[in-house]
């Protein structure tokens, strides 16, 4: 919508107050929205046995991409000169749209020409659950037009009767090709599709063709074609609406989709075949069909020769009900920190019965953090950890529930802390080409090891000094937990003066700073993956920082490094000044003293990245109107710059002036993944690189501006061009929007937590683990009633059960709540299943109809 102040004021309104609602009956959610939320988490591990080059230089420079259908949403770093590249890159993102295939493409990087696709792994959406949480080797498949087929066609067939002038009868077949949806991208762009419609039989092949639709993956054809089916017999009333059995069985309609190549060869997009005998019992047939590869596709390719790819994939689809349904489960979980012993709490029991503790940790941490319950819960489970720790040197070094909870907490709340502390120096390291290799075996020809040592020491010193002076920026919740850890460690090992520091450093240095240094892209500190030399530099820095921060190693005469060259290098830092600085920093971040807030005076860095923006105020549509710019968002302003690192912004929008952030219809500029930032001047139209990136920008912009005054209630989903809005045809530029703005999101700009979604995830985990929950319940019952001699530990070693009676009661509560939640979920699943009729857009026909 145009951002004139009077129109904006007229469009804004206060949201009505929510009324108190009694606990709903099962099935009451029918009249309210059930949110279907998708996410993908996993790891691209490695590829092996890739095809070598034919020439003398056989090695390849490889990278891997993740694609939703054919839209790239993630890219790994380039691994140079390898036929078995080791990527080891973790990924996580929300999936904002429907998709048919999740694909992984392995590329050979080519500087002068287009990158070469070596092969791909394509997994149907419905098959993703078969690979959830498991590392699997997949054979690479060849990439050609046949393997890239995707999308669906909406088709209607009718059979009419015609009587010719000479009295013979023929059947007229009416083919209405209505639309297509989700056609593949061609070279990363929307295609120019057209369809050929053929009636095929033993002795005929009549073909017709639609018009070409420009730059769209969802063309609306709405074209009707007529085919005559002649009959040898003369017209009789008896056979008036019959087609001879031998004819109808042999005729079929074939629709082929093509991309118009103009000056180059047209590209095959897929085909469907519909036998005419679908009209045997009905004179009309209408359905959506899934596009298929050609029957004579390339079946001879030796796919085993292309190599293989090892992946770990976890796809999640949550059906989030209205908030009222989650009240009892949420209440039970939030009581967990107060349960004695903590092992009898609902949150702890969930971690015990889940196949992978990590699955339970993330939703638990986010839910408890949202309600300020994480510190007492983490303290309680850490205390349980300490009971089993016999050696102070191994304190909090394992992967227990306590350490995993704290790891996730630091990732969630520590993002801004890392940006203000590490990002400037990491930018300097990544943008520089200084060599820091000090391993004699890995030195390149011409390298000077002494110069490299000085380079490495410069970076380590600069990073170390920044970290130890950053205590004022450390988030309060981290400080609170560090304080608790320090106190508990001192009580557990009162005779060890260093344990109070190692308890804190094992988290803040080993699991926080050191990890962020070695993988800055994972923590959103860098927009792209570093090259191989930079990764090596960051690894050496990370090792040194990790050891510097480990108070235990500083109290010994020797460092903990295994490599001789690292031991020699670390001698530069074994000075009293470093020890004092570490101790002072750890004291400050584990203190309960109130800190002067530094977060409110400095803007919080939220997101940055390269996107395309449309020149404002232009009245024509054209490629030149879209410019590539570097966007930066803080808690105060949205800016864009000519390139990364530019200090002077080309354009600035204060966050307080943002009135709405909404998606823009693809038809506005014939471009995908566009959104609009509506503010007090002309709307800013932006194109993201993919749907995931667009969704992330919309979410963070909505969060940061959610509490602004005069936010819009209605907006225009298209653009104002040539004197009218394309969406509603209104002529006034300041006309009230024609579509309601989407619902708001949580207002916390640093921590975006959807508590209903997290509770739904926990419900799903309990549901998947009911068998183990039952076994735990049986174990509690056995322990409670058993009066004989003490049993071997193996009998109950699968579970931590300190108090069988309290644990049993909690399990009973969990089962009762889950059983009640099952009812609305089952009702929704049945309703969804019945609405997705075979042949509908949601459930298209695969293969030939019958």
UniProtKB/Swiss-Prot annotation:
Which domain of life does the protein's organism represent? Eukaryota
Classification via Pfam families: BTK, C2, PH, RasGAP
Looking at the record, the residues that make up the PH domain are: 604-706
Q: Where is the composition biased (Low complexity)?
A: 1-24
InterPro entries per the UniProt record, alphabetical: C2_dom, C2_domain_sf, PH-like_dom_sf, PH_domain, Ras_GTPase, RASA2_PH, RasGAP_CS, RasGAP_dom
Name of the protein in question: Ras GTPase-activating protein 2
Q: Where are the zinc fingers (Btk-type)?
A: 708-744
GO biological process terms, alphabetically, are: intracellular signal transduction; negative regulation of Ras protein signal transduction; signal transduction
Q: Where is this region: Disordered?
A: 1-32, 825-850
List of residues binding Zn(2+):
716, 727-728, 738
Query: Site annotated as Arginine finger: where?
Result: 397
Q: What is its main location?
A: cytoplasm
Functional description taken from the UniProt entry: Inhibitory regulator of the Ras-cyclic AMP pathway. Binds inositol tetrakisphosphate (IP4).
Indicate the transmembrane segments per the record.
Answer: none
Q: Which UniProt keywords apply?
A: Acetylation, Cytoplasm, GTPase activation, Metal-binding, Phosphoprotein, Repeat, Zinc, Zinc-finger
Annotated localization:
Cytoplasm; Cytoplasm, Perinuclear region
């Amino acid at each position: 919508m145009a951002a004139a102040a009077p129109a904006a004021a007229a469009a804004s309104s206060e949201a009505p107050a929510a009324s108190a609602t009694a606990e709903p009956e099962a099935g009451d959610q029918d009249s309210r929205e059930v949110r279907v939320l998708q996410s993908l988490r996993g790891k691209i591990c490695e590829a092996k046995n890739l095809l070598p080059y034919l020439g003398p230089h056989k090695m390849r420079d490889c990278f891997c991409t993740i694609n939703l259908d054919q839209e790239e949403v993630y890219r790994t770093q380039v691994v140079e000169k390898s036929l078995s590249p080791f990527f080891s890159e973790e990924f996580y993102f929300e999936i904002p749209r429907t998709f048919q295939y999740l694909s992984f493409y392995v590329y050979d990087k080519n500087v002068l020409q287009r990158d070469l696709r070596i092969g791909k792994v394509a997994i149907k959406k419905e098959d993703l659950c078969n690979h959830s949480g498991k590392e699997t080797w997949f054979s690479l498949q060849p990439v050609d037009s046949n393997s890239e087929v995707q999308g669906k066609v909406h088709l209607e067939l009718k059979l009419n009767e015609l009587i010719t002038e000479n009295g013979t009868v023929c059947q007229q077949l009416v083919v209405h090709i209505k639309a297509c949806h989700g056609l593949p991208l061609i070279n990363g762009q929307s295609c120019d599709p057209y369809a050929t419609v053929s009636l095929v039989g033993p002795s005929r092949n009549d073909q017709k063709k639609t018009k070409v639709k420009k730059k769209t993956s969802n063309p609306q054809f709405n074209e009707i074609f007529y085919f005559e089916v002649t009959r040898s017999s003369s017209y009789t009333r008896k056979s008036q609406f019959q087609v001879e059995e031998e004819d109808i069985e042999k005729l079929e309609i074939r629709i082929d989709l093509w991309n118009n190549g103009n000056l180059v060869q047209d590209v095959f997009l897929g085909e469907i075949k519909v036998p005419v005998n679908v009209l045997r019992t009905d004179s009309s047939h209408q359905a959506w069909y899934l596009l298929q590869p050609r029957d004579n596709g390339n079946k001879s390719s030796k796919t085993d020769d292309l190599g293989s790819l090892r992946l770990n994939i976890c796809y999640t689809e949550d059906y989030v009900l209205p908030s009222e349904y989650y009240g009892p489960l949420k209440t039970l979980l939030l009581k967990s920190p107060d349960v004695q012993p903590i092992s009898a709490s609902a949150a702890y029991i969930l971690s015990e019965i889940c196949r992978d503790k990590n699955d339970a940790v993330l939703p638990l941490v986010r839910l408890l953090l949202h309600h300020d319950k994480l510190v007492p819960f983490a303290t309680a489970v850490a205390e349980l950890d300490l009971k089993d720790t016999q050696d102070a040197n191994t304190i909090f070094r394992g992967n227990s529930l306590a350490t995993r909870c704290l790891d996730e907490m630091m990732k969630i709340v520590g993002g801004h802390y890392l940006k203000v502390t590490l990002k400037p120096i990491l930018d300097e390291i990544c943008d520089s080409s200084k060599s820091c290799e000090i391993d004699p075996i890995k030195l390149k020809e011409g390298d000077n090891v002494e110069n490299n040592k000085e380079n490495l020491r410069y970076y380590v010193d600069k990073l170390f000094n920044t970290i130890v002076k950053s205590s004022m920026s450390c988030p309060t919740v981290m400080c609170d937990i560090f304080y608790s850890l320090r106190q508990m460690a001192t009580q557990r090992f009162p005779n060890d003066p260093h344990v109070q520091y190692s308890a804190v450093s094992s988290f803040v240095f080993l699991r926080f700073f050191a990890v962020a240094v070695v993988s800055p892209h994972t923590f959103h500190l860098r927009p792209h993956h570093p090259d191989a030399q930079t990764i090596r530099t960051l690894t050496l820095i990370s090792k040194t920082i990790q050891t510097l921060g480990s108070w235990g190693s500083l109290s010994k005469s020797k460092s903990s490094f295994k490599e001789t060259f690292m031991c020699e290098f670390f001698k530069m830092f074994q000075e009293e000044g470093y020890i004092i600085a570490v101790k002072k920093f750890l004291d400050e971040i584990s203190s309960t003293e109130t800190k002067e807030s530094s977060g409110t005076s400095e803007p919080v860095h939220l997101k940055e990245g390269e996107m395309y923006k449309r020149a404002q105020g232009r009245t024509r549509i054209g490629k030149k109107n879209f410019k590539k710019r570097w966007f930066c968002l803080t808690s105060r302003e949205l800016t864009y710059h000519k390139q990364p690192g530019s200090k002077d912004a080309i354009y600035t929008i204060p966050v307080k002036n943002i009135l709405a952030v909404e998606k823009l219809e693809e038809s506005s500029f014939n471009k995908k993944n566009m959104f609009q930032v509506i503010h007090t001047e002309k709307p800013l139209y932006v194109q993201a690189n993919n749907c995931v990136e667009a969704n992330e920008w919309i979410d963070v912009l909505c969060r940061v501006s959610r509490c602004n005054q005069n936010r819009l209630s209605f907006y225009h989903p298209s653009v104002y061009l040539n004197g009218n809005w394309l969406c509603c045809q209104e002529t006034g530029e300041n006309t009230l929007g024609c579509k309601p703005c989407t619902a708001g999101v949580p207002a916390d700009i640093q921590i975006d937590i959807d508590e209903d979604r997290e509770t739904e995830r926990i419900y799903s985990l309990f549901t998947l683990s009911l068998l183990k929950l039952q076994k735990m319940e049986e174990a509690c019952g056995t322990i409670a009633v058993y009066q004989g001699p003490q049993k071997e530990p193996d009998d109950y070693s699968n579970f931590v059960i300190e108090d069988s009676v309290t644990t049993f009661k909690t399990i009973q509560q969990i089962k009762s709540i889950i059983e009640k939640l099952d009812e609305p979920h089952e009702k929704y699943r049945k309703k969804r299943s019945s609405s997705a009729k075979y042949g509908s857009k949601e459930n298209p026909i695969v293969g030939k109809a019958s």
